[in-house]
Amino acid sequence: MTGPELFLMDTNILVYAYDKDETEKSGKAKGILAKCFLGETDLAISNQNLAEFVYATTRKSKLSFDQAIVNITDIFTSTTFKKISYTAKTVISAIEIAGEFKMPFWDSLLAATMRENGIFNIYTENVKDFKMPWIKAVNPLA
């Protein structure tokens, strides 16, 4: 599934799903994940999101490395998540996007990866970071 109906889950939403300190946001994020695991909705996730998730959750001691591996493996092996990644061509596109929209490279890399995979929607807490005309950013935690 691609196009207007598919959403990519940004790293911040994924991190909240495993955050015991942010109970309200965590509950909403867990609900989104659960719907995907149950096959009630489709989500996309990039390898970049998974790497950022490991960094964010283990750096702040929210998860052990073993727990992070289990969580990433659950997502990676699930058939209900569309997994996407970037190439060298995507990196060039991301640099161009970063320059044009004056945005951080890592956000532009995610935007370029989405565009190359036909995904135009993103669930993110950082709606302001995705102002490209081809992306609809939605904060599901609001």
Model-derived features with residue positions:
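Short, well-structured N-terminal submotif of metal-dependent ribonuclease cores
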Residues: M1-I45, S61-Q67, A142
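Acidic, PIN/NYN-like endoribonuclease modules and their adjacent C-terminal/linker elements
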Residues: M1-L6, A111-A142
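Residues that scaffold the ATP/ADP-binding catalytic core of kinase and kinase-like folds
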Residues: Y16-Y18, A56, P133
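Helix-adjacent hinge/juxtasegments
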Residues: Y55-V70, F76-S78
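Active-site neighborhoods of divalent-metal-dependent phosphate/nucleic-acid chemistry enzymes
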Residues: F81-N121, E125
